[in-house]
């Protein structure tokens, strides 16, 4: 309603794993009531077919990180800032590019850059950025495009789902409630024994993790079918 200031969603539920469906319908609804839209795309970038244009998110704030699927390690994050957003940062630093000579609607008492750099903070360790450059070069050299990685991930999820269904385990014990078509980059099984199963599998050299009653399997492009099975 018109009391809503912002809508914050994730492109993928990080606990149970399904994609957020109809993500492309949110921006018009937010614009209708004057609310800002923020999307956490961390679990979509570099593992799914995800683009601002496809999901109608050019006017939304969209953030993601370099760890996990981007393979950049910790310390890298990035955000798409819609053009023309001149909000004043609450937490800032000299990387916010403030300049008293800028002719900006937000120029008093301190003027910030007119572009997305106004949301930069204070001094930070820039080494992860250099690491990210080498990672991106590696991806290009090996022709590891987003489309290729997304296709590999989808096929791996299909394999995991097929192997699980073949076990024919009672749904009262463990179940797969999300079809592969609607999964994010990982498969999550719902079970009251998530923690104990995760620990027992780790003892056998199978690395998974769990969130509450969800046991999560995250395939990677460097794993072959035999390893997944």
Q: Residues of each region from the PLM?
A:
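Active-site PLP attachment segment
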Residues: 56-108
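Structural detector of well-ordered beta-strand residues that form the stable sheet scaffold
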Residues: 38-40, 63, 88, 175, ...
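Active-site phosphate-binding strand-loop segment of PLP-dependent enzymes
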Residues: 1-46, 69
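PLP-dependent enzyme catalytic core of the Aspartate aminotransferase-like
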Residues: 195-229
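Structural preference for beta-strand elements that scaffold enzyme active sites
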Residues: 6, 36-38, 61, 186, ...
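Conserved PLP-binding catalytic core of the aspartate aminotransferase-like
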Residues: 150-204
């Amino acid at each position: 309603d018109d009391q809503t200031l912002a809508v914050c969603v994730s492109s993928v539920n990080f606990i149970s794993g399904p994609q957020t469906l109809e993500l492309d319908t949110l921006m018009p609804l937010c614009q209708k009531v004057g609310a800002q839209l923020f999307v956490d795309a961390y679990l979509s970038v570099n593992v799914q077919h995800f683009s601002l244009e496809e999901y109608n998110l050019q006017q939304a704030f969209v953030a993601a990180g370099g760890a996990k699927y981007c393979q950049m390690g910790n310390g890298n994050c990035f955000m798409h800032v819609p053009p023309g957003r001149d909000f004043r940062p609450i937490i800032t630093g000299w990387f916010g590019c403030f300049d008293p000579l800028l002719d900006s609607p937000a120029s008093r008492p301190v003027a910030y850059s007119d572009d997305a750099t106004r949301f930069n903070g204070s001094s930070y360790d820039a080494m992860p950025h250099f690491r990210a450059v080498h990672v991106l070069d590696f991806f290009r050299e090996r022709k590891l495009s987003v489309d290729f990685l997304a296709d590999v991930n989808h096929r791996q999820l299909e394999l995991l789902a097929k192997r699980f269904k073949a076990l024919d385990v009672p749904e009262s014990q463990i179940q797969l409630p999300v079809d592969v078509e609607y999964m994010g980059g990982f498969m999550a099984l719902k079970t009251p024994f998530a923690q104990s199963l995760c620990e027992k599998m780790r003892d056998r050299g199978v690395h998974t993790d769990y969130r509450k009653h969800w046991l999560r399997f995250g395939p990677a492009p460097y794993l072959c079918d035999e390893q997944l099975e």
